[in-house]
């Protein structure tokens, strides 16, 4: 089964994953085919079972493929919603491992990751409007604020996928109801 699942990825990504982690976890084996097929996926598993990579690796692989082909545009492809702004930096750090570890071809554009929370300085918010990241890490409240501004909507309109982390912590709260309205 491992071989079948890793065949969803480019050789560079599959080799990086195997060299770094060995074998995919059961969570990854179950999630990757659905995500690769563009199906909605709900990944629920204990801490340390590879949920973050199960959510991100398909998208990183596809963004790298676009970059290798010279087709990676300066626009947003993926939105990642974290329930806490304190987790946003952790997620960006977790993404550094595959983003820096998966070999790129010479001259290949780097995948850009941006964070937009209540702590993001105004100059960084303005830069994000002119030069959107490929992956945006944000909170439910910051997503809502972006949706209510013309410039924010112009950044968000190109997104092709959405990851909501820790959904169980939000679902039965006012923040969760607000988030569901934002992503509807």
Question: For the regions a protein language model found, what residue spans apply to each?
Answer:
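Conserved P-loop/Walker A NTP-binding site and adjacent catalytic elements of P-loop NTPases
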Residues: 2, 8-14, 20-184
